[in-house]
Each structure stands twice: as C-alpha cells, then as structure tokens.
Amino acid sequence: MAAVTEEPRIRLDPTQTCRIHLCSAGVSVLLDISSASLPWIVHWGAALPGLKAAEAASLVAVAVPHRTGNGQDLPVRLDVMASPHAGWSGRPGLVGDRDSTAWTPLFKITEVHLEPLEPLEPLEAVDPQEGVTDSTLTSVGAGTLFVTAEDPASSLRLAIELELTRSGLLRGRATLTNTASRRYRVQELGLVLPLPAQAREILDFAGHWGKERVPQRRELTVGTHLREGRKGRTGADAAHVLTVGEPGFGFAEGEVWGLHTGFSGNHRTWAERLFDGQQVLGGSELLLPGEVSLARGQSYTTPWLYGAYGRGLDEQAARFHDWLRSRPHHPVRPRPVTLNVWEAVYFDHRLEKLAALADRAAAVGVERYVLDDGWFGDRRDDTAGLGDWVVSADVWPEGLSPLIDHVTGLGMEFGLWFEPEMVNPDSAVARAHPEWIMAPGDRLPTEARSQQVLNLGVPEAYAHVRDQMVALLEEYPVAYIKWDHNRDLLEAGTRPDGRPGVHAQTLAAYRLMAELKEGHPDLEIESCSSGGARVDLGVLEHADRVWTSDDIDPFERQQMHRWTQQLIPPELMGAHVASGVSHSTGRTHTLHFRAGTAVWGHLGIEWDLTQADEQESTELLEWVSFHKDHRRLLHTGRVIRLDAVDPALQMHGVVRADRREALFAIIGAALPDVEPIGRLRLRGLEPEFSYRVQDVTPGAAPHGFRRPPWWPEEQGAVLSGRVLQTVGVHAPWLAPDTLRILHLDATPG
C-alpha cells in the first residue's frame, strides 16, 4: 500500500487494503480498511506494542469468524457503521431514506488520511516471504483517522473520524452528506465499537432528581440493552458511561470497555449481542421525525462518541479525566471556593441579608459569590417571571450594583443564575411572543415547575435571550453563570406546525454558551439541570463545571461523587457544604461529615452562614483552608476508588502523577458486621517509595473513632508503597457518617 507523508498528515491509497495501528497510553486500536468496505476495528483494547505487518495480518485473519449454520455465504466483518451489507443483523448505524429509497447504502472508501499526534513509526514494507502480499501496516501513537466514503447509487457521502487521544480514549463521529437533488431524511446515524467475547457484564446508571448516577449491573445476553434519553437533556437517569466488562470487574480488576454519548439532547447508548456471539457498544443522537432532512449539499454530524478501555474502572475513568484535562479550554486556575445563596435565602432577596452572607462567606475563605434564582422580572416565586432577564426594580431598586460592589469589595468574584432555555407562561416574554414557546402545535405541553421551553431554534427568540444576557454581562462584572435547565423537553415542537425541535434547541443552547464566552473570554459557566441532569461531554465543551445534584446530603453525595467521577474529574464536579439538616432528605449530619465529603470536588457552600455559630464558622474555615492547601493535588491527581473489603467502609483518594503524594479518605458508611474490619490496601502508589502517612483530618476526632495501634500520630507513620498496596494496614473503627483523611508524602531517599 502506498503512503504519502505530508506532515502532519499521511495520505493512504484507498484502492488497496491497509491496516492502521493507533497505540497510546496502554491502548491499541487496529483497523482494517479496504475500498470495498468501511473501517473494521479488529482490536480495541490492551496495547500491542511493536506490532509488525505480518502480525497484524495474522491478527486480522484470526479475527474473521466462520460462517454460521444456514447463514450468509461470507463471514460477518463488522464495520464501524454496523452495515447490513456486511452481514450485521443488529441495529444499523444509519437509518434513513429518500422517499423510501437509498435506505441501505453501500459505501466505498474514496479517501483515507491519518494525522498523528505522536511521531510516526517507519512504514514497514511487506515481506513476501511471510505471505503478506496485500497490505502494509501504518503505525502511529495517538492520532486521528479520517475516512471518506461514497455511494453513488444512493447519492450519499460519509465522513468518519476516529481519534485515539494521548490518554488512550477513543472517540469518533460521522458526517453524512446528501449529494442528490431530492432530500434525504436521516432517522439515525451512529457508530459502534466492538466488544470481545469475555465482556459479558454490563454496568450503567439510573437515577432521578436528588439521586443521580445510581449504578446497576446485569448480564449482557442476546438482544439489545438500549438506553434512550427522550427528555431533551442528558437526564438524571442517563446511562452516563455504559460499560461492559469481564464478569465481576471492579475499580482495579477486570478488563472493561465503556461508551459515553457526548450530547445534551435526545440520545441513545446501547450494548448489543447477536445470536452469533458478536457484540458491540453503540451511540447516537435520538432524532425525532423530520429533525434532520438534508437538501443537496447539506450534512448532518453525529455527536462525539467516547470509548474508554481499561483494566478496572479507575483506569477507564482516568482516560476520560486525562483527556478532559488536556483540552486547551480546561480550567487551569485554582477552582474558586464558591458560595451559592439558594438554600440560604431561596426567593427572599434582601440586600441586608445577602450582604451579611457575603461578609460571613469572605470570613471563611469563599472566593466566589453566586446570586441564584429570584433577582429578575416578576420572579418572586417559581411560577412567574422566567424568561425576563431584566433586574427586578421591585427587589433591586438600585440594580445589582450595591450587592456586587459589596461582594467584590470583599475580594470575591460575582456569579449570577440564569435559565436561558425556559419560560414561565406568566412572564412578559411569553405574553408578547407565545409563538416562541415550544409546543406540538396549537396546544401547549403539560407544564413542569410552572414552566415551558423557550424555543432558541427561533432566531428572534435566541437573539432576545442573548441580548438580555449580554446586556447584564456588560453592565455588571459577572464572572460566572449558573446555567440551569429545570424541565424535560416533552412535545417540544416549533410553532405553528409543531415540528420537532429538540435537535435544533440543543445546538442553539451550545451556540449561545459559545457566543457568550467568545464575547467574554473570562466568563465561566456551570451546567445545572434540576441538579445533575446535564452531565455529559457535549455540554462540557462549553461549561467549566457541572452541578452534581440538588441533593447536598453528604450521605447521598458520597455515592453520587463516587460514580460521577466515572466520567468527569473532581475539579469539574460541584460539591457543596450545606446546612446541618439537609433540605432534600431531612437528615442531620455533622459539619465534619458534610465538609469532609465536599472538599473532594469543586468546593462550595450552600448554607445560611448568618445562622452558623462561632464554632461552626471556625471549623468551616479549617475545612476551606484544608481544601485550598490540597486543591492542586485534588484537582490534578489520579482518582482512586477502592473496592470495599466491607460495605460498612468505603475508601477513595487521589494520587499525584509522579506518585510522590496522595490523599485518601476512609468513610464510615454503616455499622460493620465484624470488628475490626481488617486490612485496607491502598492503590496507585510507587512500590519503591517510602511514604510518611499522616492523619490530616481537620477538627476533632469524630464520635466513636477507635485507632488501630499503627495509626499515625502527629509525626506520622512511615511505610513503603509495596506494604501499603500489597499487605495493607488495619482499618480504624468509624461510626456511620464519619471519616478520616490520610496524607501520604514520599520521604527523601
């Protein structure tokens, strides 16, 4: 196969069969490509370092299955589009038609090129003595493969991008273009990634408001495990990362393969196993009827789909975290400790009260102050005013300047709450422009939280919202927007005919975020959606953090934090210290447990600090100071979650990239069935290092805490990484809802 190198691009001859090997961070992707078919992923999994052309040819040969009994005459070679012509009888990657024709296209590759991120290995000539006469192997490190294919009979062109990132994350997307004069209706366009036979257990997530990302497991059996999001947002019940792995896999053990559909609107994510044993992960946008109808020359591009392989869930999560942290727009300055006033005042906006909150916040080390819902229009409760983004003269007769001046005078940034995609029927904008409300026609959808959806797909509505927001950003020094989204998009059509508009609405929301940030480069955005119902890699192309959940109860947050981090790193995960009695669950928790839970994310406070006594304020200051002291480690380190030796005890931590420093939390989740529980083995350390282990938990020891004899006192205990990882140390006794934090520092020598 001829290859032409035009740094940094390598053009490959599409008329000849070729094999491409991408290898980075312990992951290999081997693709077999020929003009007769779309790319076939022969291997996606553990690295194959030093792979040679002859070995690749052999690998391709042994990967072809035999013909099934009474089946088609050629073995099935599953391509990334799950094409039916290749013999795949499961869910196809493309569903569409042109007046009931062109519904099963046969694409032929017309162009292949490769853009390596890492140095190119020399192209290896074919050795005829080994019988490999039809191809060579092109091997690179991280890089992106671009494939263009056409079907002249169907008048369709397909472009596929597959990128292996430096972190070993495999991401892909496809673009379909109509080249005929008649429209082509796209019902679905997605990609699939292959799963090996040993991947037989599924882990994905369920949830609801106040309890997001609840793990659930099941066997991958013949059929389709399909997770659809039809709410116009990611959903509190989203699959999050749909993982299939070796039965019994955990945080450290077992090979796992996972897929995330990076889109904030309607979407599909699935795992499928056929009668012949072939199995895949797939993802796509879920398109409603007529949302994508392509005229000549028009194109539709899928969301990015993200595939993450790892040995254990922690390694899989690290691939997402490392990639997110490598983005040029990833937040790099220390994440400001944030006060959000919502649970302190709700809609009771009084300057005196809010200024007093600012005073108390500054005194405990807060760096950003966020004014939540209730500052605009007639928004005195949640039944009116939404959509009128003008400061209320009734509540703020002098505008927001008196509060903002007070906040910034205390050295804090100022943030403001918006819900740009929503509207109350009782609002000036709804009365003036009822045609901007999304609906299936003449009737309105059922209200949710007394609100409807404002159609940002209508240019005039988009401009109205944008201009009101820009006016506020230009009048006031707003450094941060809490961007909320508090209802599902059900029956969300564009008036007057009611055609579905979720696709256009989602892209318009992205465009509005991008436009605001382009005009205000230092602006940060938080993605909030009834709490944690918009946590995905699509919105994180524009947002700087997500709100994990409206439920700030630390008992619930322990699990939500644990599993939210399967996709996103701690610095993007909003984690707040709330009042002693949870506003969501009614549970009562000590400040020790509330703060000890929150410091592991992007720390914030959502508590009426004017009601905190002196002892609570002093303890809170200690926790905020602790977070700031360790913020760099917490927000750059490798996340470690330990499989429980006993369900009564949980443990997680972060380890610095060079393994010279770590923090671990030991959490009492319940009363154990046995006492003592036994030894805890830490992970992620360097076996040859010696570590000084210290208990650095702020405040006094919690009720019932019983130390084992080895427990580090003030000077700390020195133990090797090998001992800590292989043998372990005896756990302390912790009462439920208490915790200890250990700091590990590699000693010199």
What do the PLM-derived regions correspond to, one by one?
Residues N455, A670-G749:
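C-terminal beta-sandwich/jelly-roll accessory domains of carbohydrate-active enzymes
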Residues V332-D467, Y480:
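Aromatic-lined carbohydrate-binding/catalytic grooves of carbohydrate-active enzymes
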Residues G26, A174, G297, L339, ...:
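Conserved, mostly hydrophobic/aromatic
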Residues C18-H21, V29, W40-E272, S690-W710:
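Polysaccharide-binding surfaces and accessory modules of carbohydrate-active proteins
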Residues P397-G399, R431-H433, I437-H592, W600-W607, ...:
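Active-site neighborhood of glycoside hydrolase catalytic domains
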Residues G26, L242, A644-P687:
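Carbohydrate-binding surface patches
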Residues I109, V292-G310, P736-L744:
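Short Pro-Gly-centered flexible turn/kink motifs
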Residues H592-I640:
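Catalytic cores of secreted or luminal carbohydrate-active enzymes
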